[in-house]
């Protein structure tokens, strides 16, 4: 914050953050709804729900939840091990960017755009993996300015930690979205934060004692 300037009142900041997040989520949700089917990334549960079909929605959702748990639990364990064992000792007071990758919008759009460049205009496995990789890099890099404004030092070590850890989560959550649907990716992503928050609070308490 430049010297002599003050932050807006807390209620105003919360309103601005809420409005910004709502606008981005709405925009990318619309993008995903349009491009996901065109990129071969349809979600059977969301499709049946939106069309009001009489199918058993739980039967469509259950395999996504199971896949999210089976992949998300070991995925979160690797993320936390990488953060606390490898990267956290490097980072001073900085933190790893929280991964909130909007696969439904950004990944679907990238996969569709890449399909336009392939012979016959089809979606390929290589194209989807490239979309997962690029969206993960874009997400990590796009949040760097806000972390810099919060006082984080954007050192090479910070960039390395931010990119490696975000890309790890992006790979398995992107694969879950591609193969099983959005709910599977959401469950896996939630597991990272469900395990990360209490562990990080415990580490922080130890550091202050």
Regions found by a protein language model. Name each.
Residues 1-91, 107, 111, 115, ...:
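Specific transmembrane helices
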Residues 92-209:
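Transmembrane helix-loop-helix hairpins at the membrane interface
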């Amino acid at each position: 914050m430049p010297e002599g300037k003050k932050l807006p009142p807390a209620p105003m900041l919360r309103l601005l953050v809420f409005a910004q997040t709502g606008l981005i989520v709405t925009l990318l949700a619309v993008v995903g709804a349009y491009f996901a089917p065109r990129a071969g990334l349809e979600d059977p549960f969301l499709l049946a729900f939106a069309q009001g079909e009489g199918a058993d929605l739980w039967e469509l959702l259950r395999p996504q939840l199971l896949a999210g748990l089976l992949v998300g639990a070991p995925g979160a364990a690797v993320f936390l091990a990488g953060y606390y064992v490898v990267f956290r000792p490097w980072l001073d007071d900085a933190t790893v960017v929280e991964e909130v990758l909007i696969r439904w919008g950004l990944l679907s759009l990238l996969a569709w755009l890449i399909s336009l460049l392939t012979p016959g205009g089809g979606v390929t496995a290589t194209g989807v993996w490239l979309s997962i990789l690029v969206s993960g890099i874009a997400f990590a890099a796009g949040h760097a300015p806000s972390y810099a404004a919060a006082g984080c030092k954007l050192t090479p070590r910070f960039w390395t930690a931010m990119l490696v850890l975000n890309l790890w989560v992006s790979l398995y959550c992107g694969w879950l979205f591609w193969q099983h649907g959005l709910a599977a990716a959401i469950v896996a992503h939630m597991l990272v934060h469900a395990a990360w928050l209490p562990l990080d609070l415990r580490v922080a308490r130890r550091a202050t004692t």
